[in-house]
Amino acid sequence: MGIYPDEVTTFAAVVLYGAPVAVAVLSYLLGCINGAIATSHLCYHDDVRRHGSGNAGLTNFYRNYGARCAPMVIAFDMLKAVGAVLLGNYFLGYLLGWGVAGKYFAALFCVIGHMFPIFYGFKGGKGILCSGTLLLLLDWRIALVGWGVFAALWLTTRYVSLGSVAAAASFPFMTYFIFRDAVTTALGTCIALLVLWAHRSNIKRLLSGTESKFHFHVNAPKPGEDQ
C-alpha cells in the first residue's frame, strides 16, 4: 500500500507543529528536576526551601548544608540542561531547520521549568546554574563573556547575585552580536528577563546595601539549620 500525498502532508504538519510542542513540554519537565531540592531530600531528608533565603538554588544549598553534597546539585542541574539542549538541537535545529534557535527554544523552557517546577508547587530556583550550563551549550563565545562577567564581579565583590544579574543582562546582547538573528535574540532576551525577574529581591537588596555576600566555608551547619 502506497503513501498518498495527503498522508504525507498530514505527517509533515504533525512534525512541524508537534515537534516544538513536544520539545517545549519535555524541556520544561527536565527543568522541573531541581538539583537543590532533590539533593536536600536525598541527602538530608529535608527541603532546602525551608531554610536561609528560601531559594531552591546552589548558593542557598551550600550556605545551609555545606559542600559535601553540592556536586550532586551541580550534576542534576547540568544534566537537565544538556538533555534539553540536545532535544532542541536535534528535533528543531536539525529536523526542522531552526538552527541555533532550536537550542535557545529548548533552553527557555528548561529555565521556565527550573523556576516554576510543577513537581514542587511551582516554587523553584533562580536559574543561574541551569542558565550558566546552557551558555556553555549554546555558544562558547557567549559562555566566555557570561561566565567572565559573573566571575569578575563575584570575585571582586563577593556578591553572587551581582555577577548573576550582570551576566544575564549581557546574554541577549551577546546573542545578537554573535548570531544577528531576531528570533534567537528574542528567545535569549526572554531567558535573560526571566533570570532578572527571579533576582528582583536581590537587586533591591543590592541597591539598599543589604545583600548578603558569599563566602566559602568548610564545615557545614547541621542539616536544615539556617545561617
Describe each model-derived feature in a short phrase.
Residues 46-58, 119-132, 159-167:
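Short, non-helical or kinked segments that cap or interrupt transmembrane helices
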Residues 1-22, 85-105, 136-142, 176-187:
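Helix-coil boundary and interhelical linker segments in multi-pass alpha-helical membrane proteins
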Residues 17, 21-25, 71, 103-108, ...:
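Hydrophobic alpha-helical transmembrane segments
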Residues 37-70, 204-227:
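Cytosolic, membrane-interface loops and tails of multi-pass inner-membrane proteins
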Residues 60-66, 88-92, 109, 113, ...:
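Interfacial segments of multi-pass membrane proteins
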Residues 18-43:
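N-terminal signal-anchor transmembrane alpha helix
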Residues 36-40, 59-60, 113-123, 150-157, ...:
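C-terminal ends of transmembrane helices
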Residues 63-89:
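Multi-pass membrane catalytic core of lipid/isoprenoid biosynthesis enzymes
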